[in-house]
Amino acid sequence: KPLIEIAGKTIIQRIVELVQKNSSKKISHISFIITNEDNSTEKQLSIICAHYNIKHSIYYQHDPQGTAHAIYCAKDRLTGPVLIIFADTLFETDFNFPLNADGCVFVKEVDDPSAYGVVKNDHKGRILEFVEKPSINISNLAIVGIYYFSEGTMLANAINYILTNKLKDKGEYQITTALENMKNEGLQFLSFKINKWFDFGTPKTLLDSHHKILKQENPTIKSFVDTIITPPCYIADGVKIEGSKIGPNVSIGKNTNITSSEIKNTIVQSNCNIKGAHFNNSILGNFVEYDRDFKDVNIGDYSKFK
């Protein structure tokens, strides 16, 4: 999912770009945690870091057991000042957060906090409580998946404790459990409200965020034979479209061919061949070959429908 292209850039590339742009300190090293060895994924991550002249390393979470467990897979990098960002989120914020605390947790007000980890603050923004996906509404400040720690070893020790003692929340090892324990031991965390948040955690939120980014960036519209393009849309280089209606809210990756189709509110990745399709609220991977009429689909890489 983090390597899905949104208006021409992968989610992970956008995250790296935003951190580089908005941080007052130079990012010297990025550690990526992925589920399994994958040459294609690792190559893409390497290219992104090389573009920004950042060193990187890759760690593997072969057996997903929650957010804290994932972070601990890169425990040897948890030293000194550490910024942790979950790769299913984009944001607009600076990183000039207060440095007089042991850590900062980035938050955004949401309508439905039950889908997120949340924090409860005092009047000075100091965090009083961390709760993972609360069943009752104790706060509408959702944790957006960005955390700063002044010393990463504090987090490593806290996660090691919950792993050793098998302290699971909702069946998984959660970072909120580690944070709550750290707070109870006297460490102080501040909440830091971000300006904008684009959530990519589910297909629905991914498409909603895709729509917002297209509207914000307003890409230049290209013209094609017998085709109507309704903005906002992003169409990459090498795309061929004929006899189709595209948009609004569509991204099309490079070298994709589309004929006799109607596509809206949809992400189409690169090197696809699509004929006679009617797509709405859909996500198509790379190298998809499609020649059939479905209305609401999520298709992975190299799929064929004829």
Per-segment meaning from a language model:
Residues P2, K55-S57, R126, Q188-L190:
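Conserved beta-strand segments of alpha/beta enzyme cores
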Residues L3, V119-N121, S191:
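A structural signal for short hydrophobic beta-strand segments in well-ordered beta-sheet cores
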Residues I4-E5, K9-I84, F294, G300-D301:
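Conserved N-terminal catalytic core of the sugar/cofactor nucleotidyltransferase
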Residues H29-N36, V107, I267, I283:
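Short internal beta-strands
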Residues P64-T67, D112, W197-D199:
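A short acidic, often aromatic-flanked loop/helix-cap motif at beta-alpha or helix-coil junctions
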Residues A87:
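Short acidic donor-binding/metal-coordinating loop in glycosyltransferase active sites
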Residues L90-I162:
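Conserved core of the sugar-phosphate nucleotidyltransferase
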Residues I162-K306:
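Left-handed beta-helix
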